[in-house]
A protein has these predicted regions:
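Conserved class I S-adenosyl-L-methionine
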Residues: 1-39
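Conserved SAM/SAH-binding beta-strand->alpha-helix loop
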Residues: 76
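Conserved SAM-binding strand-loop segment of SAM-dependent methyltransferases
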Residues: 88-99
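Acceptor-substrate binding/catalytic loop of class I
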Residues: 155-171
Length: 200
């Protein structure tokens, strides 16, 4: 199991991610459109991007929300070094999401996590962890759900690495939000979850 978790510590996969993202900057994919729309609806000054990968959300913030202070963290040094070099920005740090604390989160208005909880074998645990941090807002991307028990499958990302694709039990997601005193503020995808802005 740990082999797949560590598979993202791979320079080549983040180079492919960056190449894909740079092409997408000419015509935004839907989840980027959602991100820009969500951020336009709220007043925030400090954003923490968990699982930042090659760091393209920094560029989205710079272009659309230049007053927002962006910080990106990723457990993969390969991702962080690439992001720092390409975007010429020092606000990327090597950090596992499990190292985050409530005290650290107090410095941010909003937590952004896209393609993190869904590439873990324990996505429910990760979602619970984010909620327990109690940020004021959270943007949760690619929050895939199922009516059955939470589960995952294995797939190949960027034709490079084997990784997980996690599906959360929808009732458990709703329960976790309720227990954490969060409400779904925006869900433009019109799905039970998928891409959400939640707030306290």
């Amino acid at each position: 199991m740990s082999t797949y978790i560590d598979s993202w510590k791979n320079k080549k996969v983040f180079e492919k991610q960056l190449e894909t993202n740079l092409n997408e900057l000419n015509s935004y994919p839907q989840h980027w459109e959602y991100f820009v729309s969500f951020m336009s609806k709220i007043n925030v000054q400090h954003l923490l991007d968990i699982g930042c990968g090659c760091g393209t959300y920094y560029e989205l913030c710079r272009k659309h929300f230049p007053d927002v202070k962006y910080v990106g963290v990723d457990y993969a040094n390969e991702a962080v070094e690439l992001a720092k070099k390409h975007w010429n920005y020092s606000g990327f740090y090597v950090k596992n999401y499990k190292e985050l604390t409530k005290e650290y989160i107090k410095h941010f208005d909003i937590l952004h996590a896209c393609s993190l909880h869904n590439v873990l074998p324990n996505g429910d645990e990760a979602l619970q962890f984010f909620i327990d941090l109690q940020p004021r807002y959270m943007i949760l991307g690619k929050l895939l759900t199922t009516k059955g028990a939470s589960t995952y499958k294995v797939y190949k990302a960027y034709n490079e690495i084997e990784t997980y694709l996690y599906y959360h039990n929808i009732d458990n997601v709703k329960k976790l939000f309720k227990q954490g005193n969060y409400e779904v503020f925006c869900n433009p995808s019109q799905l039970p979850t998928e891409y959400l802005l939640v707030r306290k």
